[in-house]
Amino acid sequence: MMLDQNEKIWESISKLAIKLANEAGFILYENFRKPLSVEFKDKSGLDPVTNIDIQIQKHIRNSIKSHFPEHGFLGEEETSATSQNKNTSEYLWVVDPIDGTKNFVAGLPIYACSIGVLYKGIPYMGAIFLPWPNSTKGSVIHATKGSGAYFNDEKILLCENSQEGKSSGLVTLPGSFTNIFNPSEILKNKIGDYRMTGSIAYEMAMSALGISQFMVSNAPSIWDIAAGTCIILESGGLVLEGVSERKRFRIFEEFKWKNLNSFNPNNESFEKVTASNLRKWQKPIIAGAPKIVNFTASNLRKR
């Protein structure tokens, strides 16, 4: 079957993203539980960055520049040069070289390399490397908008495990869940068996695979969820973002959940979006099986 020009572009982007995720995985496996150079991005020593974070991001960025020189790049470990107040490219690669750096440093094999591609702010492609049991090279879960989601070469389709939309299986929640959110009494009794992993991208992959029925994150950055959002949507799942709006004649803001379809801030047109805007993106999200996500959202508010 002949592909049109747009399909050819996304096929090339997808192949490169999957290749880079696998290459990142090789670097991660080669350096796991090995001596690392660790620095901290904050004065409190809570936000580490390793030489492997920097190495992987540099490798990914250079490869993208070589294949798609006109594409934009936004990485977690970027310097201030990336955050300049300038319009971004229509195609923007959003990368977290190691999501779960604390786990990686500690020797806990729960981490991910997340590579997302946005088109005019819309999540169009995602590839996430995952360390995987009984695998010498790990696995990559990936998706392209309109083409479905895959775990390595196997197509995945998210199924509802609860006909009532109430979770009875595993869910992943942030440690600050009860401090940030106010669940209803109904939700408290039906929230499921919760876990905390320390990697948002990893949790989104688990939700796309149906291992976790849904996940909640209170303030992810764009590089944490750009890839996972596309993957969950293409697997048949749902991703909601929490927004606060001040309505006319109201003193207090109203919090509500809505579909996450674009990362463009405040629904602005793409032409007005800058790399600096996107770097500052942070909103709470719920993601996973649609019925459970909707049930959770209808019973969950911010404090």
Feature names for model-found ranges:
Residues 157-180, 184-198:
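Short loop->beta-strand "edge-of-pocket" segments that line small-molecule binding or catalytic clefts
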Residues 86-150:
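DPxDG-like acidic metal-binding loop motif
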Residues 1-98, 297-301:
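N-terminal subdomain of lithium-sensitive/metallo-dependent phosphomonoesterases centered on the IMPase/IPPase/PAP
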Residues 28, 53, 64, 101, ...:
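Residue-level signal for inorganic ion chemistry
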Residues 36-41, 149, 190-197, 239-240:
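Short secondary-structure junctions
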Residues 1-19, 185-188, 202-303:
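Oxyanion/phosphate-interacting regions
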